[in-house]
Curated annotation (Swiss-Prot):
Keywords: Cell membrane, Endonuclease, Hydrolase, Membrane, Nuclease, RNA-binding, Transmembrane, Transmembrane helix. The gene is rny. This is Ribonuclease Y. The chain crosses the membrane at residues 6-26. One of its GO terms (cellular component) is plasma membrane. Residues 237-300 form the KH domain. It comes from Lactobacillus delbrueckii subsp. bulgaricus (strain ATCC 11842 / DSM 20081 / BCRC 10696 / JCM 1002 / NBRC 13953 / NCIMB 11778 / NCTC 12712 / WDCM 00102 / Lb 14). GO terms for biological process: mRNA catabolic process. NCBIfam families: HDIG, RNase_Y.
Length: 547
């Protein structure tokens, strides 16, 4: 009984152990399968991630390679453009250098011509001095001859008295005339003889006096020229502006040259940029435009912001400053000469002469000099000194605006002085100082003499510069005479004319016709060396302000 009980327990225990072992094995197998599944899934996930990452890396490599190729292409394009810009800049530099060299050669030639003229004047003065010495010797000899003739005449008179006495005795003996009648006859004969001798002496003395008067007149003129001599600086057609560094040249030129084109169009002055370190050159025959351009460029350099709108603003400011300086120059001239009560508009026109030259001579300085000379001579002669000074100062007032108004500077000056109620004698002196009308007073004669002394003194004037300016003025006048032309500037020393037209009056098609018409008139009416380029510019702007 007991054995039967034990057996089932053992069996149960064995079964339990077997079941436990089988359960463990089954659990292990299941867990192993799960682990293997998870490991496979993890491996597949890792492989997928690695494949995705590898694909992304390949894409990134492709993009980087594409970007690298694009960068290489951009670099090659930049190098090509850089080389082209360098070649273009070098070409422009060569052109500017050639222009500057041509200008320097022209100035050297002009200086050589001036030196030759000065040498000729010195030779002429030496020759005149030698002639004066010879004339003085001749006068000394003539004086000795006159003295000898006087002694001879005295001897003849004594001889005549002796003859008279003999004739008296003879007449008394022959005609039995009384002494008084005989004396009358003899005196009449002697008087006729002495009259002839006296006439010869008078003619000789008149010739001598005339020669001495000429010599004294020459001496007076020389003294007047020496007393009126003033320091004179030769006028030029260029101004030099200093730069803080050479990098500023590129900013002045601007992108594709737009800044330099805007500057030249707004000022009418040629801006020359060459390889001269830290400097640029402004070239133009109109001194007022050149001064405006110089001040505007200096302001732009100081400000640092250089673009077309800023250029236009600075040019307007510089033009206002120059206009103020012109008025101050007129007032200074009046104060220097002690002239009062002149119309302000006439004072402003007078100040413009500061920037006007005639044959290379500054017209304002020349006018002040003429006023001083005329006043000095009027005071010496007891005439109205203040009126003479006023007439001398205003005698060339027409030259201030003769580029803008039709007519000679004399006609313009007469019209201006009448308009602003100057005295009639002043108006007549202006009208008569070139012999166009009769002189009504000695004041007009004094103005002519003072004008001659001031303009004729050595080194005062240079004809070549005046001819050059006249040619450029005529060139601008031809270009500006057409309807629709707003402004016309002669630049490049007269080798180019830039014509600004009004877009509302002239179309794009018409500017070509206008350029050819201007060319034909220039070829027909002007004499000039080389070629002249006619450039017609039509620009239309649209401006809107956002608030």
């Amino acid at each position: 009984m007991m054995n039967n009980t034990v057996f089932p327990l053992a069996t149960v225990a064995v079964i339990f152990l077997i079941s436990l072992v089988v359960g463990c094995l089954i659990g292990y197998a299941i867990r192993k399968n799960v682990w293997e599944t998870r490991a496979e899934n993890a491996r597949q996930s890792v492989e997928a991630i690695l494949a995705k990452a590898k694909a992304e890396v390949e894409v990134a490599k492709a993009e980087i390679q594409a970007q690298k190729q694009a960068a290489e292409a951009v670099k090659r394009d930049a190098e090509t453009e850089k080389k082209a810009k360098i070649l273009e800049a070098q070409e422009e530099i060569r052109d500017y250098r050639q222009k500057v060299e041509d200008e320097l050669n022209r100035r050297r030639d002009e200086a050589a011509r001036k030196e030759n003229r000065l040498q000729q004047k010195e030779d002429t003065l030496d020759h005149r001095s030698s002639l004066l010495d010879d004339r003085e010797k001749q006068l000394t000899q003539r004086k000795a001859q006159i003295k000898q003739q006087e002694e001879k005449v005295a001897g003849l008179l004594e001889e005549a008295h002796g003859l008279v006495e003999k004739q008296n005795d003879k007449l008394l003996e022959i005609s039995r005339l009384d002494e008084e009648e005989a004396k009358k006859i003899v005196l009449a004969q002697v008087s006729d003889h002495l009259t002839k001798e006296k006439a010869e002496l008078i003619r000789a003395n008149e010739e001598e006096i005339s020669a001495r008067a000429d010599r004294f007149a020459h001496q007076i003129i020389v003294d007047a020229i020496q007393s009126s001599a003033a320091d004179t600086v030769a006028e030029t057609t260029v101004s030099v502006v200093d730069l803080p560094n050479d990098d500023m040249k590129g900013r002045i030129i601007g992108r594709e040259g737009r800044n330099i084109r805007s500057f030249e169009a707004m000022t009418g002055v040629d801006l020359i940029i060459d390889d001269t370190p830290n400097t640029v050159t402004l070239s133009g025959f109109d001194s007022i435009r050149r001064e405006v351009a110089k001040r505007a460029l200096q302001k732009l350099i100081k400000d640092g912001r250089i673009h077309p709108a800023r250029i236009e603003e600075m040019v307007d400011k510089a033009r206002k400053e120059v206009n103020d300086d012109i008025y101050e120059a007129g007032e200074s001239a009046l104060m220097e000469l002690g002239i009062h009560r002149m119309n302000p508009e006439l004072v402003k026109i007078l100040g413009r002469l500061k920037y006007r030259t005639s044959y290379g001579q500054n017209v304002l300085a020349h006018s002040i000099e003429v006023g001083k000379l005329a006043g000095t001579m009027a005071a010496e002669l007891g005439l109205d000194e203040k009126l003479a000074v006023r007439a001398g100062l205003l005698h060339d007032i027409g030259k201030a605006i003769d580029h803008d108004i039709e007519g000679s500077h004399v006609e313009i000056g007469v019209e201006l002085t009448r308009k602003y109620h100057e005295p009639d004698l002043v108006v007549n002196a202006i009208a008569a100082h070139h012999g166009d009308v009769p002189k009504l007073s000695f004041i007009a004669d004094l103005v002519v003499a003072a004008d001659t002394i001031s303009s004729a003194r050595p080194g005062a004037r240079s004809e070549s510069l005046e001819n050059y300016i006249r040619r450029l003025t005529e060139l601008e006048d031809i270009a500006g005479s057409y309807d629709g032309v707003k402004q016309a500037y002669a630049i490049q020393a007269g080798r180019e004319v830039r014509v600004m037209v009004e877009p509302g009056k002239i179309s794009d098609d018409e500017i070509t016709v206008l350029a050819h018409e201007i060319r034909d008139r220039v070829e027909k009416e002007l004499d000039y060396p080389g070629n002249i380029k006619i450039t017609v510019i039509r620009e239309k702007r649209a401006v809107a302000v956002a608030k």
